[in-house]
Amino acid sequence: IAHDCNLACKYCFAEEGEYHGRRALMSYEVGKKALDFLIANSGSRRNLEVDFFGGEPLMNWQVVKDLVAYGREQEKIHNKNFRFTLTTNGVLVNDEVMEFCNKEMGNVVMSIDGRKEVHDHMRPFRKGAGSYDLVVPKFQKWAESRNQDKYYARGTFTHYNLDFSKDVLNLADLGFKQISVEPVVAPS
């Protein structure tokens, strides 16, 4: 949904959302065609899942909302059931995003890499400042608003934090009940 991002994560396979191309946001028309394609090729499958990710999907927030609305309309017409999910770095999360996602997203993935020093090292803004202090309070509020269910605080762990069990424990100490661990090899 977004070939763009507001962070410069050191291990990003999407090259700050560019995917080895140019920065761009998916149009509503392209997203609509993708949902139509999914419906047309789903056969007798009733349950369909769409994950909004990027880059950072909240950089294209209006299109996310519009595509969810379109998907909900199509459910009735085609006897389908969409399960929408969202993966975010949290920078643009606000009350409106939380409220909408709590209503419409079957799951949200909150990207946080554990302890402050690890997260800020691996997930900085483009100019180098850390993002931990901005995103952690939002993610804590969001997890509580989802009754500690149907979300994951997902840590991406690298050679930089081989003691990642400390990061998992830190996430638990922050109050997260749903924790996911994704290993990766980072260049630095």
PLM ranges: what are they?
Residues G31, L35-D51, N60-A186:
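Radical SAM/AdoMet-radical enzyme domain recognition
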Residues R22-M26, L58-M59, G130:
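Short, surface-exposed alpha-helical recognition segments that flank or form part
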Residues G54-G55:
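Short acidic donor-binding/metal-coordinating loop in glycosyltransferase active sites
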Residues E15-H20, E117, A186-S188:
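A short, flexible beta-alpha/helix-coil linker loop
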Residues I1-Y28:
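Canonical Radical SAM [4Fe-4S] cluster-binding loop centered on the CxxxCxxC motif
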